[in-house]
């Protein structure tokens, strides 16, 4: 990428993300999606995490399954679309674009739809399901976090006849490449890399508060529960994350041994 202005804007974005408090991870994620979407003229964006549940070679997705998704802006039929996609995966009717992404797992990569599917794919029901939601093209950055977990940053073109360009692909790739620490923290904020299941909205809210300097009494007031109740919640959450106290939580967040 040879655009000095865009490079400087991306570096400023990295600085902005580094300055956001750990307890504001959700806001930081939305800021990242919104800013990169503006840079590449995407009308919407999402973050998704996937976990490799099995290494069975017979599995067309190589064991990878989506766990959590966050959209910058809601899309029509979001819940119905997601449920239909999951049913299709379980029944073996899998979108060729999804298979292609799964087979690229383990490498930092960025691609547009036309980079990973043949021309015939655009005549399938899978592409029609995109168009039904107003999506005409997508650009995805795949980010490996560890051997079993990946993050996906997707950017959506909601206008017909204007697919993403090679330059826009390079911009998205570069913007995400320097944020290894951030990608890991986004997954941690959802409990993905350490908990057996993603954190609930209430658990994510509690986690954000535990990453501040507030004592449990003030956290209880914020959540509208008693101090005893919040203490129980804290113990359950820390156990789910595999740490024994708030110091252990901070160590986990910073990527250090507890």
Which stretches of residues belong to each language-model region?
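Regulatory input/activation interfaces that engage signals or partners
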Residues: 4-5, 12-23, 27, 31-146, ...
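Regulatory loop-to-helix N-cap segments in sensory/regulatory domains
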Residues: 157-172
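Regulatory hinge/linker segments at domain boundaries
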Residues: 185-205, 258
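Short alpha-helical "packing" element that flanks the helix-turn-helix/winged-helix DNA-binding module
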Residues: 203-210, 249
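Recognition helix of helix-turn-helix DNA-binding domains
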Residues: 213-248
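Intrinsically disordered, low-complexity basic tails/linkers immediately adjacent to helix-turn-helix/homeobox/MYB/SANT
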Residues: 251-258
